[in-house]
From Swiss-Prot:
Xref: NCBIfam families: PRK00451.1
Source domain of life: Bacteria
E.C. no: 1.4.4.2
Organism: Macrococcus caseolyticus (strain JCSC5402) (Macrococcoides caseolyticum)
GO biological process, one term: glycine decarboxylation via glycine cleavage system
Enzymatic class: oxidoreductase
Name the UniProt record assigns to this protein: Probable glycine dehydrogenase (decarboxylating) subunit 1
Highest classification ranks of the organism: Bacteria, Bacillati, Bacillota, Bacilli, Bacillales
Keywords: Oxidoreductase
Enzymatic reactions: N(6)-[(R)-lipoyl]-L-lysyl-[glycine-cleavage complex H protein] + glycine + H(+) = N(6)-[(R)-S(8)-aminomethyldihydrolipoyl]-L-lysyl-[glycine-cleavage complex H protein] + CO2
Family the UniProt entry places it in: Belongs to the GcvP family. N-terminal subunit subfamily.
Gene that encodes it: gcvPA
């Protein structure tokens, strides 16, 4: 019997088995030891028609807590930002609706130009010479930057601040383990990197120094001083940065960063749990040929018309295989398009205004919480800051959910020393009323 959605009949199965020379499905898996194979039938419910199935799925979806149902003060790498309506309209067009970067430029000029614009805007925001077409997310961008540094310097020691997002550091450790690289983590002092410890750790074997700006605790690192520590050494200076903050903050390129990486989720990509993000990777011209991922370049055809092509492809794994700069090639072209459309819709003034509202609203919330007697950790911050509570953050967040709020990130999940510490994010979407109500609620729960 054929199935509406699984068109594999018994006749189809028989024909396929005859083609590969087996008599049963079990023979197909004979290399798997029988003792570890599942025996019997799977406990799968009977199939449903479309209407009751949709009803069941909707009931499951309604259990989710989202920024549409609750007011969110959660950040830590994924943020609730304004997304211009035009973003979904553009990325839903069939011409664009793919994550794949095109190999045939003559039929893909629109998509190639969109990627080129993404690269251009990222390079401008970061103050760097060039940027690639995108990476999987901020974590892979961060780890790939370390791999580039190790390959370029031929050193194997990676120095990374513990003020970098812990998930990015976890990805870095995964990359480093397989290549027998040494990762040295530098402690945090007063919500920023311990500069004395960082300076002492740098030696002739160091491939790179890696920090985040603004860092995981929301604080602004002293990039100028950190860059000075690498002068006279082979070590590259790598900065992971929230690109929206660079509409307001001095870009890392102006401090002499060699590589700037991060996550473009803040531009046009909804906050979700485990869904696709869009990493970015920017570099100096000196390191351009060692960058991972696709690069779109501008050129002219034989009639003198402007055109766009995938360029410097000899770096990539589909040509050089084991000698490629990275295994990353096609990845997040669709989300890069979303980020491009969002940045274009906002414009320079809009990105500045968005970043400024984040800063001002976060500062308002910080000052109000200090006035109310909360212990707010000191530091110059952007749109996130740390508050120490009298009770476990998990308990406070559970109570906040019942009141219609998504609380901040529980830093106790990162390190025990941050037990009862909450990382609070304030974006341009939060109103004064929401901020004041949140403070009142946590004041009661913290008593």
């Amino acid at each position: 019997m054929s199935h509406r959605y699984i068109p594999l009949t018994e006749t189809d199965k028989k024909e396929m088995m005859e083609t590969i020379g087996i008599n049963s499905i079990d023979e197909l898996f004979q290399d798997i030891p029988e003792k570890v194979r599942f025996q019997g039938d799977l406990n799968i419910k009977p199939r449903k028609s479309e209407t009751p199935l949709l009803r069941e799925l909707q009931a499951l979806a309604n259990k989710n807590v989202t920024s549409d149902t609750h007011v969110s003060f959660l950040g830590a790498g994924v943020y609730d930002h304004y997304i211009p309506t035009v973003v979904d309209h553009v990325i839903s067009r069939s011409e664009f609706y793919t994550a794949y970067t095109p190999y045939q430029p003559e039929i893909s000029q629109g998509e190639l130009q969109a990627i080129f614009e993404f690269q251009t805007m990222i390079a401008e925001l970061t103050g760097m010479d060039c940027a690639n077409s995108s990476m999987y997310d901020g974590g892979t961008s961060f780890a790939e930057a370390a791999m580039l540094a190790c390959g370029h310097t031929r050193n194997k020691k990676i120095i990374v601040s513990k003020a970098v997002n812990d998930q990015s550091r976890a990805v870095l450790h995964t990359y480093a383990k397989g290549q027998h690289l040494e990762v040295v983590e530098i402690d945090v002092k007063d919500t920023v990197t311990d500069l004395d410890a960082l300076k002492a750790a740098i030696d002739e074997d160091t491939a790179c120094v890696m920090v985040q700006y603004p860092n995981f605790f929301g604080s602004i690192e002293d990039l100028e001083t950190i860059k000075s520590f690498t002068e006279g050494t082979k070590a590259l200076f790598v900065v992971s940065s929230n690109p929206m903050s660079l509409g307001l903050l001095t870009p890392p390129g102006e401090f002499g960063a060699d590589l700037v990486v991060g996550d473009a989720q803040v531009f046009g990509i909804p906050a979700q749990l485990g869904g696709p993000h869009c990493g970015y990777f920017a570099a100096t011209k000196k390191l351009m040929r060692k960058m991972p991922g696709r690069l779109v370049g501008q050129t002219q055809d034989d009639e003198g018309n402007r055109g766009f092509v995938l360029t410097l492809q000899a770096r990539e794994q589909h040509i050089r295989r084991d000698k490629a700069t990275s295994n990353i090639c096609s990845n997040q072209a669709l989300n890069a398009l979303a980020a491009s459309v969002a940045m274009s819709a906002l414009g320079k003034n809009g990105v500045y205004e968005m970043a400024n509202q984040n800063l001002q609203k976060a500062n308002y919330m910080k000052s109000r919480m200090v006035e109310e007697g909360f212990e707010v950790l000191e530091g110059t911050t952007f749109n996130e800051f740390v508050v120490k509570f009298n009770h476990p953050v998990k308990e406070i967040n559970e109570k906040l959910l019942d009141e219609g709020f998504i609380g901040g990130y529980d830093l106790g999940q990162v390190e025990e020393q941050y037990h009862n510490h909450m990382l609070i994010a304030v974006t341009e979407l939060r109103t004064k009323e929401e901020i004041d109500t949140f403070i009142a609620k946590v004041g009661v729960f913290n008593a």
